[in-house]
């Protein structure tokens, strides 16, 4: 379920928000203001779900999945504005460096965070181990929000061919999918890759259970 929420919540909302995002002269207000409410704030409910677990496991699961879905859908809804803001701030010849460098640093910090979370899960009793892990995630993503708020976005007028309504946006998407063979093949490839990844979660559970 977490895998489905993670993938669907990231990609699906972008289809509904891309058109309205394209019509905005500035994307930063969406990324900062809307992003805080839809993407950052939900993670602060995860420690509450862990605290509720000893008293009401059902309530804890409801809070957890609701907060996780809220976070995922919010991140997907804001993603077009974030991507456009990054494109405005970095020229074409610098974007690969930006994404590569940030992915490298983020992965390294993620490894350290995973190791520290594993240590907390072992050394603290339940539910405090999960409370501390979730709290660390909430604090970290909030700190990243403050860094993101320092971004200086160049103001640009919306493109002349920007979709004027949601219906026009969907028509524009269909024209691109039907007319661009390479992009259509790319979408099919991404779909098949994600289908192939469906078994990874079961492999992880099986490894933990048998090994």
Predicted regions located by residue number:
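Membrane-interface helix caps of multi-pass secondary transporters
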Residues: 203-211
